[in-house]
Structure formats: structure tokens, C-alpha cells
Amino acid sequence: MLSIQNFSQVEADVTQIDANETFALFYPEQRPYFNEGNDIIRSNQDAVYTRSINDPLASTKLIHQGQKQRIYWLAAYDQNAPYLVAGENKSYSGEGNEAWANIFSYQRILNQGNHLGIMTTNRFFVDGGNGQLARLNGLIGIGNNIDLNFEFNYTSIEEPTKDWIDSTEKQGGKTVSLDGETKTGNGLDIRLSRANDNWSSTLIYTQYSPLFEAPLGFINQNDLRSFVFHQQHVRYPKSTSSLIQYFSANLEGVLNYNIAGTQKFAGIEASSRIVWRKNFRTGVELDYTFMENYEGFIGKRFTEFSMWNNYNPSEAVSIGAFFSVGEELWYDEDDPAIGDSFYAGSFSTFQPNSNLRIRTTIRYGQLRNKNDQSLYFKGYLARSTINYQFNNNLSFRLISEYNAFDDELFMHAAIA
């Protein structure tokens, strides 16, 4: 299909709390045109992120899904391409200019859902500078309900000479600023999983070299080796009248190192999700960090507990709330520390009739110094979305959001 159209997304992004973030935040793709066929180019390493095609003037797209093969090809001319440089402890971003973008993926379907695939992505800036990525990936069953999922990415970047990123820092021996340097990097993700009716286990090894960047992906951290073990147990009731309709328990352990071998993180997470009778849901999570290394500061033995509940008394009403309390590392380059954190919020949906739907959310967060309880940050995000469907062809949407962290009010109205 050839498309020259309005590429705007259906709904504005829900703002995330970024008061203590050093890496760029991931926002999911919401534009219908770019979402179509995204399962073919899905990447465990986010080697492809179609939102990196930010403001397309025109695009051509081809999707083929057959019994033996799947093909995805997309080309676009972007009027305002973003630029993201990954780092070990933080990422750097800037607004670029016009660029040509291209994504091609071929997947060979084997027996029993196995597959092998190749992919290339390319971006060429009109004023100079380009990036190339090549990927090999696959899913192979190796018996006894064991699956091997792998992905290898190789990138070659020729930076533009631009002032889009203002930084004097270095990463992997190269400058972060865009001064025409050439970089090559690689990423590797290997997942071994085994599952039956009630149990599933997954081992994950992920690696990002110090200069790994993806021209049309979302790589906000590199110089990383990560080892993850995940175990899940699931139970279903024998009767629809049982108090508990679904139960899952999860345990996950994480070990992170940089490529030089310095330990960056060690922690475990235990969580559970319960679906109760009469449309009530509960989730709990306990995180324990043995150690975390940020810019040479090593925080040890801190904990966070979180819980959420959701209730749907009818199809017209959904209400929920969450909270999280514990300890958190304050990511300040000059004075990092462990602080006392607290987050809470609510979310609800009301649909009084078939035409009108109202959604509201409020999220509060704060972090305090453990010694004197002085504030590192404090604020909240409040958002409401009103949808009114006049008929099958006409609808109205009004979004209002207030960000108390930045004292900003955002409003967006749309007719579709």
C-alpha cells in the first residue's frame, strides 16, 4: 500500500513521571498506520521503534503474511527526525531535521511456529549523516516445551555534524556530541524458556556494546551485560464460583554488569496477580535491591513495595488505585543517594451510555532524603479524557492534563 496521509496518533501520550530518570522514556506507538504489521519487526532489544519516524511527510508500506514467509517493508520521508545517543548511565537526545527512513524485514516460517528472520533499517539525513542496522533473529523449539529465542543486531553510524546534542561527555571512547564520528556496535539477546500448564521459566542474556545505537530504534542504554532469571506459577479455579478466578506468582532475579565487568545492579523481584470473583483484581510486588552502582556511588540493600487494585462493578464503570512505598536511588551526578519514595494514584473509566466515555487518572510521586527528609522531588500528574461518539463516522475527543512537576497544562481537542 502507498500512503500519503495524516500520520497523527489517535490519542496524545499519557505523560510519565520523569523527575528521577536519566534515560529517555519509552512511549508506545499509537499511530494506526505504523502499528499495522509491527509484530513482524518486533525486537526484544527495541532495535526498531517506529516512533523514531517522528513527522513523516509521505510513506510507502508493504506487508505480506503467507504460510511460509512474512515480509515487511516501510519507507518514509521524515521532516523532523529525532536523534538519540545511548550511554552507560544516561541517554542524550536532540531534535534533528529531514531524513529518509527505511525498514525491511523478511521472516521464514518453519514448522510448529518456529521462524528465522533478517532485517535491515537505514536512515539518511538530508544534510549528511546516516545509520545502518542489520539483524538476525529466530525462534526455535528444542524439545520438551523448551524454546530458544535469539536476536543479534549490528549497527554502523556515521554521525552528522550538528548541534542537536549539547554535551562534552564521552561514551565508549567517542564524543557524545555530533561531530561526524563513525561508530559501530552490536547487541545480542538470547532467551531460553520452558513452559507447561502451570509453570514457566525463562533465562535471558542481553548485551549492548558501548557504541551500540539503533538509527530507527530505541536504545537508551548501552555498555551493558544483563542476566535475568524469571519463574512464574499460574493457577486457574476448578469452579467459576471460586473466590479466586486466577492466580499467578512470579520471581525474577537480575544481575547487570558493564562490558568491562563492573557490577552495576543486583536485585530480585517477587510479584503476584489475583483475579477475584465479581471482577475484582489485585496485584502486589516486592523489589529488593542488593546493590546498584551509579556514577561510582553504590547503594546497598533497599526495598520497595507496591500494590494495585481494580474493580469493574459493571461494563460501564471501572475504578482502581495503586501505591508504592520504599527506597529509591536518587540519580544525581553530583550527589547520588538513597531516598525514601512514595507513589500513589487512581484510575477510573465511566461510560454512562453507548456514546460517552470518561477516563480519569491522577498519579502522585515524591522522594525524600533519608537523613533530614528534605525533598528531592514532589508532584503529581492529573489527566482526563472525554470521548463522545456521535455516530459511526463522527467522534469528539477532549484531553486535559496538568503536570505539577513542571507546572504545565496541556489540552487537546480532536474531531474524527
Provide a role label for each language-model segment.
Residues L2-L255, D287-M291, K300:
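Outer-membrane beta-barrel channel domains
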